[in-house]
Amino acid sequence: MAGNNPTSSEYIQHHLQNMTFGLHPENGLGLAHSAQEAQEMGFWAIHLDTMGWSIGLGVLFLWLFRSVAKSVSTGVPGGLQNFVEMMVEFVDNSVRETFHGKSKLIAPLSLTIFCWIFLMNLMDLVPVDFLPMLAQKIGAWFGADPAHVYFKVVPTTDVNATLGMSLAVFALIIFYSIRSKGLSGFLAELTLHPFNASNPFVQALLIPVNFLLEAVTLLAKPVSLALRLFGNLYAGELIFILIAMIGLWQLPLHFAWATFHILIITLQAFIFMMLTIVYLSMATEKH
């Protein structure tokens, strides 16, 4: 931690700080030793813990589903095969009910989004001190100061991760809009709606207003996707940290909050997936 006996503020700040690698203007290339150093590294700094856990959990998801696909049987399926089939059927039904286009990419994309975000959210149930303390001990073996070893284990509590996923969805929204309506149709949607007039001069005057409203609506989609997921998981992680600080009573409270938090973990993954499907369905609709 920030010391042998950290204050409550230091304890919280330490748990909410990412392991940041980047180019510091004074210290050169390396790991940040404080939140201020991480900030001074600027935009191109990398959160190693977020990258590591998100990629690792993504690989775990791919390996798990590939293993089930390779060992699938037509007889009595095992528990894991039942679970995977249930997940695939659930997501497929959600896509069929919500997406009205013809793309075959949406169902596997939705399955990937739901499972990947669910696994990242699930890391919030790991005891808050376990992996950070393990990282500190490993850092000490390599000669690092344990007080300056930061390690966050929930990728979705990092706004950079949630914003990165939402920007990928935003890029797909633009792609499907242009593919479905053409570039001219996409631009017309941005400039000729919601207000229109039969008089060409009046319509020309309305173009900036329409563009401003439609641009705000379009940009609000990835921002709301990112901040909703980040805010809910960040708040959940903060509550776990606060519970860990109260001593003897932390175990029953931790269990109670973890039980409730399972609903949040699942619900937020589902909401992100469903909104992605809805946005992509809207992008393919022609007005």
Curated annotation (Swiss-Prot):
UniProt-listed InterPro entries: ATP_syn_F0_a_bact/chloroplast, ATP_synth_F0_asu, ATP_synth_F0_asu_AS, F0_ATP_A_sf
One GO biological process term: proton motive force-driven plasma membrane ATP synthesis
UniProt keyword terms in alphabetical order: ATP synthesis, Cell inner membrane, Cell membrane, CF(0), Hydrogen ion transport, Ion transport, Membrane, Transmembrane, Transmembrane helix, Transport
TM region(s), chain numbering: 45-65, 106-126, 158-178, 238-258, 260-280
Subcellular localization(s) per the UniProt record: Cell inner membrane
GO cellular component: plasma membrane; proton-transporting ATP synthase complex
CDD domains referenced in this protein's UniProt entry, alphabetically: ATP-synt_Fo_a_6
GO MF entry, a single one: proton-transporting ATP synthase activity, rotational mechanism
Membrane topology: Multi-pass membrane protein
PANTHER family given in the database record: ATP SYNTHASE SUBUNIT A, CHLOROPLASTIC (PTHR42823:SF3)
HAMAP family, per the entry: ATP_synth_a_bact
NCBIfam families: ATP_synt_6_or_A (TIGR01131), PRK05815.1-1 (NF004477)
Main function: Key component of the proton channel; it plays a direct role in the translocation of protons across the membrane.
Subunit text: F-type ATPases have 2 components, CF(1) - the catalytic core - and CF(0) - the membrane proton channel. CF(1) has five subunits: alpha(3), beta(3), gamma(1), delta(1), epsilon(1). CF(0) has three main subunits: a(1), b(2) and c(9-12). The alpha and beta chains form an alternating ring which encloses part of the gamma chain. CF(1) is attached to CF(0) by a central stalk formed by the gamma and epsilon chains, while a peripheral stalk is formed by the delta and b chains.
Annotated family: Belongs to the ATPase A chain family.
Protein's name according to its UniProt entry: ATP synthase subunit a
Protein species of origin: Chromohalobacter salexigens (strain ATCC BAA-138 / DSM 3043 / CIP 106854 / NCIMB 13768 / 1H11)
